[in-house]
Amino acid sequence: VRLTSRDASLTNQDLSMSDRSLRATATTAAAAAAVVFAGPALAQSTIDKMKQFKVATTDLNIPTVQQGGPNAEAIRNNLKKIKLPEGFRIDLFAIVPDARHMAVGPSTNMLFVGTRKTTVWAVTDRNSDNVADEVKSFAPSLGFKVPNGVCWTKDGFLIVVEHNRVLNFPAAEFFYEGPDVAVIEVAGQGKLIPPEEESFNHGARTCRVGDDGKLYITLGQPFNVQGKDKVAMYEQIGIGGMVRMNPFDGSGREVVAKGVRNSVGMDINPKDKTVWFTDNQTDGMGDDTPPGELNRITKPGGGGEHFGYPYIHGNNVQIAGTAAAPDLKDMKPPAAWTKPQVEFPAHQAQLGMTFYNGKQFPAKYQGGIFVAAHGSWNRTKASGGLIDFVSLKADGSADKHEVFAEGFLDPETGSYRGRPVDVAVWKDGSILVSDDYAGAIYRISYRP
């Protein structure tokens, strides 16, 4: 049975919250629907035209999102309840419906934001005051499907990873004003995973381009725990793990991590170039087990480093043979499986992460990791809705972790004021935090 992930954001509460931004996104939804419901043939015709720099649409009315009004004021009031270390403050950077993973533009004051729906947002701070001036739909003629993952190549090409397609936009920062944008198909529709393995569950991808020039992509597996018949196939394909490939044509694909349940966040340490990722673990085993994970890939070759799932969670929580996975009772992890760098409290749903390489924050944060905890969805008492900070040792391994920002979860009512998804370092060394529940992006800055 496929179960809803704790990463799922379409709860009844979320739907009511989304009503506030419905008017702002209605035009976007209509434009996307025109492509999606016209069928695959029209969608492919559109991308074929864009690959050849031809006009795919004559509609220049690109949907934008209002940045002021009652919704913005309500969000600002909620931000007054967020607790931060001394000297830090949090402000509203932009209203961005369904905001998920972020990619800060390398050449401009722009931010590209993925969603779990049908839109990628282009966010612009034109006057460099660290507040967005414009939020508009990016490449609306394409008709995206769960374009959650966004990242940059070394030469400034924007990668968008959908549920089962990977696109490369060579000049996203400069051609975003129009509905048609030059595009390269890295992996065409149905080529990232076998179409028969597509699912509504655990389908949000994330990406980074490594120091080796390869595109790294996380691939969640769709079950709470996959059946015995799926284990070997998933490990071979990279479902429930991570793959890497050429970011321009998808060639040279290989599995670099397996034994992963559902990673929805990754980053690369700029110092030693190792790849790190979060992993959300099995539901239904209890409120306080199993722990969430922060992992580090140290042996990417040889068919992929194994991180224990679906046999063991964390350092020693058994899953194979338990009520969650009875048909795996005779299966064991490889002898050399890799333990997590950090165990997080169970079901907090740590998602996006970033290494802090800015210069604004105090020395203790330099080179460390900020991690967004989306918050639990099926725990008896809700947990999460915060930003963690993980410091590193001299050898590059994880040292300590602590809560950096909290208050997105109301401790008295157990309801969410916001649900952090991703963290990114902004131009001035502050950090941005996306929130798909409030439909916003926040900026956390420091002043002694």
Question: Where are these predicted regions, by residue range?
Answer:
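Blade-level signature of beta-propeller repeat domains, shared across WD40, Kelch, NHL, RCC1
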Residues: 424-448
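Beta-propeller domain segments
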Residues: 45-85, 204, 221-229, 233, ...
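Beta-propeller domains
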Residues: 111-131
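Short loop/turn segments immediately following beta-strands, especially the blade-tip
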Residues: 123-130, 169-178, 298-303, 389-396, ...
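Beta-rich, blade/repeat-based domains predominating
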Residues: 96-109, 141-157, 193-214, 258-273, ...
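Short loop/turn segments immediately following the C-termini of beta-strands
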Residues: 107, 115-116, 163-165, 171, ...
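Asp-box/WD-like beta-propeller blade repeats and closely related beta-sheet repeat scaffolds
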Residues: 163-209
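Conserved beta-propeller blade signature
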Residues: 110-113, 157-160, 214-218, 274-278, ...
